[in-house]
């Protein structure tokens, strides 16, 4: 069975020269995902997902973030460019998690 979620968040940049770009999941959604995926989470608590933003889909992982008590979704450059999004933009995201992964 595939688990499906959606949320809105602002894109932000990790402050380093070659820093990553992330979306932080809302805490309540992170708690739901944490509970739903407990039996099949990967190393360091990461969760394999398929993410979709503005019609652009990619496979990645959610990474737990103790600072925000949530998960971080990395957004690679190709997706940011194709979706036309930048730092500070409010982004609607759909996530799919397969229990078989």
Q: What do the predicted segments below correspond to?
A:
Residues 1-69, 87-90, 94-96, 100-101:
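Long, compositionally biased stretches
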Residues 80-88:
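Short active-site loop/helix that positions an aromatic residue
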Residues 25, 74-75:
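A conserved hydrophobic position in a structured secondary element of the catalytic/binding core
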Residues 37, 76-81:
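Short alpha-helix capping/helix-loop boundary micro-motifs
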